[in-house]
Each structure stands twice: as structure tokens, then as C-alpha cells.
Regions:
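NUDIX/MutT-family hydrolases
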Residues: 92, 102-136, 150-158, 176-185, ...
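Active-site segment of metal-dependent pyrophosphate-handling enzymes
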Residues: 4-6, 52-55, 59-102, 117-118, ...
Length: 225
């Protein structure tokens, strides 16, 4: 008789102002890979839905509740877990770290943010899961403005530019980027400004969720050059 366990793993990205894209990792308190870094996650309880399981694990192991969370992919290669045959349903999530204080508990010894460009050695097949999640994130930016989940409620346009440039990993045509974003009506201009250094004060914007929902029904593709 087969004995296959079902688990969930969460790839949670965060963005600190003008820094690299960050990834949430936990330090394992138990074997296997005790003391090693891994994605938050664990086995699904018998009476638990998958979505509830990943939210529980994130709360228990890191003390956070993502602003955006969706199923990513299912991983089930033989031998991916040395203990049992384990099939893991991975999730992709986004949080604004400014609003979330990490708190490790349960079977996590610690929880920290790491730059996606400087990750430590990882347990299980979690490096592969992260690579697939990063590709999905970069693709989704082309048709769904999920990046706004990583910004403050009010933000200067330069922060949005920096975020997109950081996630896709290359320079963008700033003039074309601004023109496209503004033409879609996805931003509401506020009466507030933000002054940084000796430069001109920047106007602050908010994300227009209603406008996005209208565009989503019509179908649109936001190509970043």
C-alpha cells in the first residue's frame, strides 16, 4: 500500500526600498537538514485544505500573512524527502516586509529575509522550487500588476520603477514604462510628496484596484521593455 504524504511549501518574496528582491527562509529546528535553511512549509493535516495549510505554516514558522498568495506548482520527484514519499504543493506569495515582523516558532529555529542573489545552501529541492517561482513572478508582471503588493500604500513613481527593474533583473526604458503605466490609469495621484536627498520632491501615488479589475476583465498585456 502506498504511503504518500502531502505537504505545502511557500516561496514568499519581499522588497525592501532600493534593495534586492528578498526571499523568506526559515532555519529548520528538526531533522532532516536540522540547522539548514529552507522554505516555510510542512505536512498538510488530515482535516485541512491546502490553502489553510500553507497559511498555518507561514503563521507558525514566520508569523506572517501574505498580501498575495497563489498555488505555483506541484513537486513530487522520488527521493525529494529522505524520510518518506512526499508530494509538495508550492505556493507563490508576496508581502511588504515593512508591515510584517518575522517571528519564528513551531519547528523553525529562525526566520530571515535573504537576497535572491545571495541565497544560502537550501534543504530538499527548494532551490528548484525558488527558481520556478522567480520565473513565474517575472512572467506575471507582464499581465498582472502584483508588484504593488510589495510597495507601501503611497509611493513615488521611482519606487515602482526600481521594483520592476529589480524583479526582472535588468534596466527598463523608464520613459516608455511611465507612459504605459499612466495610460492604463492604474495609478491615482495624491496630494502628498516625498523628498529624498537634493532631488526634486516626488509626487506620491496609490494603486487603482478598481481600474485594474476593469482591465483584467477586458484582458491586457503589459510588455516591459
Amino acid at each position: 500500500m502506498q504511503d504518500i504524504k502531502v505537504a505545502v511549501d511557500a516561496v514568499i518574496f519581499g522588497y525592501f526600498d532600493k534593495q534586492d528582491l528578498q526571499l523568506l527562509l526559515i532555519k529548520r529546528k528538526i531533522e532532516p537538514f536540522k540547522g539548514g535553511w529552507a522554505l516555510p512549509g510542512g505536512l498538510v493535516l488530515d482535516d485541512e485544505n491546502l490553502d489553510d495549510a500553507v497559511k498555518r505554516e507561514l503563521h507558525e514558522e514566520a508569523g506572517i500573512k501574505p498580501d498575495f498568495l497563489e498555488q505555483l506548482y506541484t513537486f513530487g520527484n522520488v527521493g525529494r524527502d529522505p524520510r518518506n514519499r512526499v508530494v509538495s504543493v508550492a505556493y507563490l506569495g508576496l508581502v511588504n516586509p515593512s508591515y510584517h515582523e518575522l517571528f519564528a516558532d513551531s519547528d523553525a529555529e529562525d526566520a530571515q529575509w535573504f537576497s535572491v542573489n545571495r541565497l544560502p545552501s537550501l534543504a530538499f529541492d527548494h532551490k528548484n522550487i525558488i527558481d520556478i517561482a522567480l520565473k513565474r513572478l517575472r512572467t506575471k508582471l507582464q499581465y498582472q500588476p502584483i508588484g504593488f503588493n510589495l510597495l507601501n500604500e503611497e509611493f513615488p513613481f521611482s519606487d515602482l520603477e526600481n521594483l520592476y527593474r529589480t524583479i526582472i533583473g535588468r534596466e527598463i526604458d523608464r520613459r516608455n514604462f511611465r507612459k504605459k503605466i499612466m495610460s492604463y490609469g492604474l495609478l491615482n495621484e495624491t496630494n502628498n510628496i516625498k523628498k529624498e536627498g537634493s532631488g526634486r520632491p516626488g509626487k506620491l501615488f496609490t494603486f487603482n484596484q478598481e481600474k485594474y479589475e476593469e482591465l483584467e476583465k477586458e484582458g491586457f498585456y503589459f510588455e516591459i521593455k
